[in-house]
Amino acid sequence: MEKTAEKLKVNESLLKTVLCSATFWGLLAHGMVLFNKYSFHDDVRYFNEVGATYESGRWMLGILGSLSANLLGSKNYSLPVVNGTITILCIAAIVYLLVDSLKIQSKPLVILLCGSMVTFPSVTGTFSYMFTAPYYYAASLLGVVGAWIFHQKKNVVALLLCTVLMACSVGVYQANIPVCICTLLLYMMEDIRQSDMNWKAFWKMALCNATVCIGFVTEYFLVNQYFLNQFGVVLTDYKGINHFGRTNLSNYIYRILCGYGSFFYPSTAVEDFSARYVYTLLIIVTAIIAIFVLRKMYILKTPKGCQTLLILIAYPIAACFVYLMVEPWDVHAVMTFGQAFAFALVVWFIDKYPEDRTKVEGALCKAAVALLGVLVTLNIRYSNILYLKADVMQTQMISYYTTLITRIESIEGYTEDAQVVYIGEYDKHDKNLVGISEYFDDLDLATYRGEPIFNDYAWKEAMEFWCGFAPELGDAAEFDGNAEVASMPCYPDQGSIRCINGKIVVKFADEP
C-alpha cells in the first residue's frame, strides 16, 4: 500500500483526513436526504434520466447519461445513498487536490475547508435534484483536475488537456466556469508565493491561464453547436441559457457590480440570515488579513504584493462569474458552488502567512478560523431545516393526492377507463390545508420553497410516482364555456368532481 501510494504520490495522511472529514460533515449536513427519498418537482420528472441535456447546452451530461445507461445496462435512477455518496466523494477529491497543491499544512484548517465546501448551500440545493447531483459534482472535479494537471506540468500538452477537461466540465453544467477559474487563480497565487517571479514571468503565467479560459470556453461552444446541429434542437431560453454572457456594456457593468456584491454579501448563495452575516464577516476579516500580508510584501519591495493584489481583485468576480453569464435575478443557489472556493482562499491566507504575526494578526486569524467553524455549523443546521421541510411537504403532498384519488374514484360513473379532466390544475386552493408556511421560515432555496407543492408543474408525475394513480387524461379545452362546469364549485368543495359526458371532470379553479 505504501509503495503504491508513493508511486502515485498520494498523501495518505491528507487523504484520510479529507475522507473522514467529508464523511463526518456529509452525514451531519445531508444525512436526512441520503437515507430518505424526497422526490417532487424536477426529481420526479427526471427520476430515470440525468436531466435536460443538449437543449440546455449540457452536451457532456447527455454523453455521460448515455454512457451510464450503456455501461450499467439499466435506466438512470435518482438514488439517495449512491448518488449522494458519489457527490460528497467528488467534493472530497476537490478539497484533496486543492489542499495538496496549495500545500495547506494545518489539519484543523483542512477539516474546516472540507466542512465549508460539503455543507455549502449549493450542495443542499443540488441534492433536491438527486438524479443529476453526482454528474454535476463529478464535472466540478473534472474542472479542478484540469487545473491541477496544468499547474503540475505547465506545458502545451497539459494546457490542451486542461482545456478539454474544463470544456467537458462546463458541458455538464455551465455554472462550473467559476470553479475552473477560481482553481486557476488559487494555483497562480501559490506559484507567486513560492517564487520571486518578475513581472515578465507573472504576465506570461497570466497569459497562459487566460489562454486556458478562452480555450475551454471556445471548445465548449464549438462542441455545443455540433450537438445542436446533430440533434436538430435549439437552446432553451430557461434562465437565459440561449444567450449566456450576451448583453450590452452597461448591463455587463451592472452584472459585474452584482457579482462583487454577492461575493461580500451572498444573498443568493447563502440564504440563511445568520450564516450570511457570518460569511460576510469572515470575508471582511480575511480581507484585513490580506491587507497586512500585502503591506509586509510592499515593505520587502518585492513584486509579490502587487501580483497577489491583482489576483485578489479578480477573485471575487471569478467566484461569482455566474452573474456575468446570466441576469442576476436568474441566478439561484445551485449555480453558486464556485463561491465556496472563497473558503479555499481564506484557508490559504491563514495557513501560508504565519511568520512574524503580531498579536492583532494572530487574533484576526483565530477569529477567521472561529467564524469558519460557526459558518459550517450554521450551514449544517440550515440543510437539516430544509430537509425536514421537504419531508413535511412531501408527506402533505401524498396526503392531498390520496384524498383526491379517493374522491375521484368515489364519483358515480367512474370507471378505470374513464378519462379524467383537470380544470385549473395549476391554480389549486384549499383553505384548510395549512401547508408549511406556519412551521418554516420562507426559505427560497430551490426546490424547498414555500408555495403549495400540489401546484408544481410536475404534480401529476408526483401523484403517479407516490400514489400510483395515472388515469388517461382528457383535454380541458373541451369544456371551455361549458355551463355545467361553470356552475361547479372548486375543489375541495362537494360537487367539484363530476362525471360529464362519460369523463370525470375535476374543477380546481374557475376559468380566467
Language-model regions, residue ranges each:
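Perimembrane helix-loop-helix junctions
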Residues: 179-213
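Juxtamembrane "helix-exit" motif on the non-cytosolic side of transmembrane helices
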Residues: 33-40, 68-72, 119-129, 192, ...
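Membrane-interface transmembrane helices that cradle and orient dolichyl/undecaprenyl
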Residues: 143-159, 191-197
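Hydrophobic, aromatic-rich transmembrane alpha-helices
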Residues: 261, 265-304
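Intrinsically disordered, polar/acidic, low-complexity terminal segments
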Residues: 2-93, 97-111, 198-206, 226-234, ...
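Transmembrane alpha-helix segments characteristic
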Residues: 23, 114, 299-325, 375
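Membrane-interface micro-motifs in multi-pass membrane enzymes
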Residues: 54, 58, 83, 87-89, ...
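Membrane-interface alpha helices of multi-pass inner-membrane proteins
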Residues: 158-174, 179-180, 185
